Amino acid sequence: MYVVKVYEEDSGGYLYVGQIKGKFLTYEDAKIKIENQNHWCKHKFYFRIEEVI
């Protein structure tokens, strides 16, 4: 299982702002979700996929 954490660029680096709702079975599913988010997102967010144990 994977989760997608969302960060925003800050003057001191990256600031954690939250997590995309849901858990994903595969890394590829998580990547697709990120690509869909980027289509409508107007802010400069950065996404990180993390495996949940």
Residue ranges and their predicted role:
Residues 15-28, 50:
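A short, exposed loop/beta-hairpin motif centered on an aromatic-Gly-Thr core
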Residues 8, 17-18, 35-53:
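Short, mixed-charge low-complexity intrinsically disordered segments
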Residues 28-34:
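Short amphipathic alpha-helices within nucleic acid-binding modules
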Residues 1-21:
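N-terminal acidic leader/helix
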